[in-house]
Amino acid sequence: MQLSLDSKVALITGGSRGIGAAAVRLFVEAGAKVVFNYQSAKAKADELVRECGAANCRAVQCELSSPVAAAHLVSSAVEAFGRLDILVANHGIWPPEDTPIDKMTDEHWLRTIAVNLNSVFGLIKHSVAQMKKQERQVESAKGDRPPVPTGHIVLVSSTAGQRGEAFHCDYAASKGALISMVKGLSTELARDNIRVNCVAPGWVATDMSADALADPPTRAKVFATIPLGRVGTTEEIAGPILFLCTPYAGFITGEIFNVNGGAVLVG
């Protein structure tokens, strides 16, 4: 058994940069056809498609801030490759400024929840509908229940979703909600052979964290909280995401996969 995704179609959100781009590359290398979205980084998205090959990879411009936008993206993935086997909800925003709860505007809160949570609801809703439709088609053709999962969903949360984050309660709440969704949906969708898991990264070297990590005092403080003494790479997060979508993880559902250098252990 290999880490192979031959004949599988994956939708990876936030795929033009960071963890998402690393996941797109790994999934294509594993044999999957991949559709990913980008918000405004068209040049990076086009470059990634050229790197992976247009026959294997498609980019869709889509700002994921509502369930309606999510429905459009799922439809685009199915239109591109005819089916959908894997959803990786990787997109999200982390407002970098420290904001006390009594100073946080309604707009600030609602924007984070819209992007990090509401759009994920839409992605899951429409992806599951497509996966169930495919399962019925397989059952009708074979006359029995498929012996292997018909769908895989991986949500990308955060250590903040497990232990909170002062002055970023909007972000922590949105990521904590994803963990609760995984716990509920993994049981709900098991009967449909759809596995649902979560990867919870800690600090990762991406453009989202670049400014914070460029500040020496902040960098030293961050490193001191991580037993492995460094931040993760995007590939070190994308690897576990890939694993959870392969046959090696066929008996895993409802799990919160911590990928943070041990930070949660000492947080």
What are these regions (language model features)?
Residues 158:
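Residue(s) in the substrate-gating loop at a strand-loop-helix junction
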Residues 97-101, 105-113, 222:
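Substrate-binding pocket helix/loop in short-chain dehydrogenase/reductase
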Residues 98, 163, 241-242, 253-267:
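Short C-terminal tail/terminal secondary-structure segment
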Residues 16-17:
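Conserved glycine-rich cofactor-binding loop
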Residues 129, 187-191, 250:
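Alpha-helical segment proximal to the catalytic Tyr-Lys
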Residues 30-47:
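Conserved glycine-rich Rossmann-like NAD(P)H-binding loop of the short-chain dehydrogenase/reductase
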Residues 124, 174, 182:
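Active-site helix of classical SDR
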